[in-house]
């Protein structure tokens, strides 16, 4: 189906992905096609958050690359890589925030501090996203450590991060 979804624009099958998604929904399949990838996300709001973020990201290569890679890693049924999907999701936010602050070397924490002032986001919201970044970045976290006692990253973790990071990108875009 992924192949056909990707091919549908080339051979001009109108609304192929939409039709398949309608059938998947009707049959309660538990899957949706997003960006020609079959993923275990079915909530219309969650799908919309990801699709909207991908639309925003299409203007920024780095953000688009991270979001697409996160989706790719999440949707790989033979060898899913949830850990790296989480990394790519938070990296998309970091890339978008560095674009918003016009500081390509800014860490997410530094960029959020500036965005808190310029985009008037609430300090608790800034803190919560900083904490999510910390979850992915601390010594036992997802981005830096591959020790035996590591956190086991699950499908639910990767879905949460992709959806949350997509929603946060959408939120920041709306605040511009």
Where are these regions (language model features)?
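Long, positively charged binding patches that form subdomain-scale interaction surfaces
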Residues: 40-126
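Long, charged low-complexity segments
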Residues: 108-176
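Long, hydrophobic, amphipathic alpha-helical segments used as structural scaffolds
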Residues: 8-11, 15, 31-35, 78, ...
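Acidic-enriched, low-complexity/disordered segments with a strong bias for Aspartate over Glutamate
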Residues: 6, 15, 36, 52, ...
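Internal, Lys/Arg-enriched amphipathic helical interaction segments that engage polyanionic partners
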Residues: 1-65
């Amino acid at each position: 189906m992924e192949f056909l979804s990707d091919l549908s624009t080339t051979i001009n099958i109108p609304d192929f992905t939409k039709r398949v998604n309608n059938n998947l929904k009707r049959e309660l399949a538990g899957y949706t096609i997003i960006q020609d990838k079959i993923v275990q996300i079915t909530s219309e709001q969650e799908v919309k958050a990801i699709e909207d973020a991908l639309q925003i990201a299409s203007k920024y290569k780095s953000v688009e690359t991270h979001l697409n890679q996160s989706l790719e890693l999440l949707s790989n049924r033979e060898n899913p890589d949830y850990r790296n999907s989480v990394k790519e999701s938070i990296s998309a936010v970091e890339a978008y925030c560095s674009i918003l602050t016009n500081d390509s070397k800014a860490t997410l924490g530094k960029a959020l501090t500036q965005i808190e002032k310029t985009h008037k986001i609430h300090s608790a919201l800034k803190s919560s996203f900083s904490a999510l970044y910390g979850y992915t970045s601390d010594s036992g976290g997802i981005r830096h450590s591959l020790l035996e006692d590591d956190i086991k990253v699950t499908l639910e973790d990767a879905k949460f991060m992709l959806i949350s990071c997509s929603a946060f990108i959408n939120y920041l875009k709306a605040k511009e």
